[in-house]
């Protein structure tokens, strides 16, 4: 038997085991721990508690026109933030058979990607503007789990609660607003085939970029701190962001920022506690600088004035790359000197490649 056939047999066998596990769970209450994720089991439990049968014929239905109009109007801000990334993602999925959709916090599709020739009929029905993909409407699905758990999810074939959805695979990720609430959900789905790539990772990446664009549109009266380990991430959709009130309280931090800082996304602490620099000092800076955080990480950091003008100011700051590069190289050379010229040790200390050290040395020598 060919390796391709072996792979198909493995996939089919895994899905068959999940299907049987779901039936045993519904009929006998046996929890298939280890075979499917806990979030999926919990979704099955909720569907079962609503009195739903796995053999119901559940098809996507459209919201009434007046309800859809209200949903689209309410979601205009997130659509504006998402539109550039939705175009990019739609183009990337052209030859995959996948369809993508942007959902509002209630699970209603507010934007659907192009219907590519390889896309299946059922998945095209799922990803139509106005379709309700919430758990109450469609049972277990990636968007439904995102709404319940707040985290990214992937649901494959027999993991869906309703048997009629077993040909679908879907992956979804949340998009949060500046209060940490759910602003929207990004979903991609495919029918009667495997994704062929890490769908969950891709949807998380695009959702994070959309979230950053949305966060930059925060209400007036806040300052925006942007930071990252890498210089070229400043001004991108993948930088750490923090929203700061005029009194210096940090009221929200995006996911990247929270991971860099080692804090929660809603710390409600002052800037100095979180970043190790006084707010009055930071807000006087009009350029991107290198700064060492309280946890020891050295990051590039910038603060904008009125968030309404944040992206323009950030672009202006980032355009002064020469001064930032000088600081970057100086930090590398100081660390190299402190390690007696040991390049490998300095690279480990800074968390950079040895090539970065060599480039900094070459830049210094050419001046």
Which functions belong to the PLM regions below?
Residues 322-367:
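Bacterial C-terminal helix-turn-helix
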Residues 261-271:
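PAS and related sensory helical modules
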Residues 110-111, 261, 350:
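PAS-family sensory domains
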Residues 1-137, 141-157, 167, 176-247, ...:
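Intrinsically disordered, low-complexity terminal regulatory regions
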Residues 162:
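An active-site-proximal beta-strand-loop segment
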Residues 158-159, 167-172, 273-319:
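PAS-family sensory/regulatory modules and their coupling/dimerization elements
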């Amino acid at each position: 038997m060919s390796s391709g056939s072996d792979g198909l047999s493995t996939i089919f066998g895994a899905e068959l085991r999940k299907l049987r596990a779901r039936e045993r769970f519904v009929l006998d209450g046996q929890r298939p721990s280890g075979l499917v994720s806990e979030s999926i089991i919990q979704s099955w439990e909720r569907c079962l508690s609503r009195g739903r049968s796995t053999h119901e014929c559940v098809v996507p239905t459209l919201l009434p026109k007046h309800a859809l109009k209200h949903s689209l109007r309410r979601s205009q801000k997130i659509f504006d933030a998402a539109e550039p990334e939705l175009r990019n993602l739609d183009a990337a999925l052209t030859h995959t058979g996948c369809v993508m959709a942007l959902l509002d916090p209630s699970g209603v599709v507010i934007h659907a990607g192009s219907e590519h020739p390889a896309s299946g009929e059922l998945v095209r029905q799922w990803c139509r503007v106005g379709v309700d993909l919430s758990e109450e409407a469609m049972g277990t699905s990636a968007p439904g789990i995102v709404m319940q758990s707040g985290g990214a999810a992937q649901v494959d074939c027999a993991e869906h609660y309703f048997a009629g959805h077993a040909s679908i695979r879907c992956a979804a990720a949340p998009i949060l607003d500046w209060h940490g609430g759910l602003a929207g959900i990004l979903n991609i789905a495919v029918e009667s085939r495997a994704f062929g790539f890490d769908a969950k990772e891709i949807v998380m990446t695009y959702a994070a970029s959309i979230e950053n664009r949305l966060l930059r549109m925060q209400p007036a009266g806040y300052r925006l701190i942007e930071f990252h380990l890498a210089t070229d991430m400043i001004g991108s959709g993948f930088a750490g962001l923090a929203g700061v009130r005029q009194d210096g309280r940090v009221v929200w931090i995006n996911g990247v920022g929270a991971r860099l800082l080692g804090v929660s996304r809603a710390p409600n602490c002052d800037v100095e506690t979180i970043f190790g620099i006084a707010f009055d000092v930071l807000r006087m800076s009009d350029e991107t600088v290198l700064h060492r955080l309280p946890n020891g990480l050295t990051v590039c950091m910038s603060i904008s004035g009125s968030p309404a003008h944040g992206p323009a100011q950030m672009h202006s700051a980032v355009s002064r790359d020469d001064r930032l590069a000088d600081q970057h190289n100086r930090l590398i050379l100081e660390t190299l000197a402190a390690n007696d010229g040991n390049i490998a040790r300095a690279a480990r200390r800074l968390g950079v490649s040895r090539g970065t050290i060599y480039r900094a040395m070459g830049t210094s020598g050419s001046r």
